[in-house]
Amino acid sequence: MKFLRYGIKGGEKPAVLDKNGKIRNLSSYVSDFGPENINLDTLAKLQKIDFETLPEISNLSRIGPCIVKPGKFVGIGLNYSDHAAETGAEVPTEPIVFMKATSCITGPNDNIVIPKNSKKTDWEVEIAFVVGK
């Protein structure tokens, strides 16, 4: 199952990508994908649905961030030796853990706002996943 959120910024709705590559609306089963409902109970409920019976989203204008109101955004720096080498840094012996503002999470095609006075913006992409109980 591949879940996503679609719609205007701040008004995203939950959806699923079905086995035929069509995006289907999940709003009648879950209000959104956020900390309060990303859990095993919700997943079990969603696994019972025949997604092909759900309304198809044909006028998809935007895919939003994967989750609404995440609690934390934890990053690991220089986690690839190639990236460390290209920055001229030593490969760390232990992970470099850092936090990022959750407001920086965007949809896959959203603009990325670079602060006006930024002097050292790194182009690297962060890979994220949601961890829960």
Mark where each language-model region is.
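Glycine-enriched loop-and-adjacent helix/strand subsegments that border the catalytic/binding cleft
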Residues: 70-133
